[in-house]
Amino acid sequence: MEANIINGKAIAEDITGTLATCINDLKLQYSLVPCLIVVLVGDDPASHLYVRNKQRKAEMLGLRSETILLPSTTSESSLIDKIHELNNDDNVHGILVQLPVPKHIDKNLIINTIDPRKDVDGFHNDNVGRLFTGQKRNCLIPCTPRGCLYLIKTVTHNLSGSDAVVIGRSNIVGKPMACLLLGENCTVTTVHSATRNLSDYCSKADILVAAVGIPNFVKSSWIKPGAIVIDVGINSVEEDGVKKFVGDVNFAEAKNVASAITPVPGGVGPMTIAFLMVNTVMAACNQSGIENFVEKYLDL
């Protein structure tokens, strides 16, 4: 039997549709308009595309949004000065520095210069520390893993006792994903490039999250029949002279083994942007002393 194809695009649209109502009510009840500022250094075409998509979605939802474009020659100190300026602006609730930044700039220094209350990517050490110590209600959670967990819960809400395997150990997806699954009482294994017999671990997983950045890396023979498969990868490949995007999982094979699987595109990607918007609204509420407002609209 073919797997349930988890329509991340439709689910993300449901989330943002509800969030738009939340934002409108926030304006009516508190005269608060959440504001997201994206800082983009350099002229990487993919980064510019991502930023345009984020800004378009923010404006559609009724957020204030602005993109600050800086040349690739921008010094680290100049970027830090700009972030301090945004940190000190009470009208700015969310700050995102689009990654990657040019090589002469220390990415971690920049991330940790952002006020953690405004760190809508959820990458600041304060937010990471709170997440990893079980304080997810008191931090901003990285958008992609948060979106992945939401997708998993559309298939089964009770994850307690499930065996989960996360392929990848990045700070952006792999590590926080493992942490979120632990928080749901899963038994979590993280595998990576140095893992021996990686497929053996995958084949025992009730929940398999692939975030490795290698096209069609996960074969159907690695997947436990009936598993939930979340494919975070988005890789550009060329087939018969035509470029297309594929995930880290061999979708054509895997959909005949898994019980539920995300497609690429249209799976995890839209959820990342949706939860960036959620984080921005939550950040605005937190900075304004408005407690649990977003949670009245969305089951987070």
Curated annotation (Swiss-Prot):
Cited Gene3D superfamilies: Leucine Dehydrogenase, chain A, domain 1, NAD(P)-binding Rossmann-like Domain
Record-listed E.C. numbers: 1.5.1.5, 3.5.4.9
Keyword Hydrolase: yes
Pathway: One-carbon metabolism; tetrahydrofolate interconversion
GO MF, any single term: methenyltetrahydrofolate cyclohydrolase activity
Key word Transcription regulation present: no
Cross-referenced SUPFAM superfamilies: Aminoacid dehydrogenase-like, N-terminal domain, NAD(P)-binding Rossmann-fold domains
Database matches in PROSITE patterns: THF_DHG_CYH_1, THF_DHG_CYH_2
Catalytic activity field: (6R)-5,10-methylene-5,6,7,8-tetrahydrofolate + NADP(+) = (6R)-5,10-methenyltetrahydrofolate + NADPH; (6R)-5,10-methenyltetrahydrofolate + H2O = (6R)-10-formyltetrahydrofolate + H(+)
Function: Catalyzes the oxidation of 5,10-methylenetetrahydrofolate to 5,10-methenyltetrahydrofolate and then the hydrolysis of 5,10-methenyltetrahydrofolate to 10-formyltetrahydrofolate.
Subunit architecture: Homodimer.
Family named by the database record: Belongs to the tetrahydrofolate dehydrogenase/cyclohydrolase family.
Name of the protein: Bifunctional protein FolD
Source organism of the structure: Ehrlichia canis (strain Jake)
Source taxonomy: Bacteria, Pseudomonadati, Pseudomonadota, Alphaproteobacteria, Rickettsiales
Gene behind the chain: folD
